[in-house]
Amino acid sequence: MIRRKQHIINLIRQKVNEIDNTAEVILYGSRARGDNKHDSDWDVMILLNKKNVDKKVEQTFRHHLLDIELEIGVPISVFVYSKSDWEGKYSVTPLFRSIKKEGILIP
C-alpha cells in the first residue's frame, strides 16, 4: 500500500512538472495524515512562482492530472495559487492553517 501511495505521489509530481517544474506541490488532508480510506480523494495544493493565477491556470493543472484520476479511480482535488498570494492574503484562512500543520511537500 505504501508503494502505491508513493507511486501516485510521483505521478502527480511528474504531471505538475510537465507544466511548471518550479511549482511547489503539497499533499494535505487524509492522505497526508494517513487516516484516509480506500476511496478517499487526494488533496493537492500547487503553489506557483507567478503573480496571476486564474481559473484557466487551475483548469490546466486539473486537466493534466485527469489521467491519474482515471488510473487510480479516485478524485484528485486541486487548488492552485500564486505562492505570494497564498503566503499573503490567504494566510489567515483555516485551509492555510490546516495545510501548514499537516501538509507534506512533494519534492
Residues covered by each model-derived region:
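Short beta-strand->loop micro-motif that forms the acidic, two-metal-ion catalytic signature
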Residues: 42-47
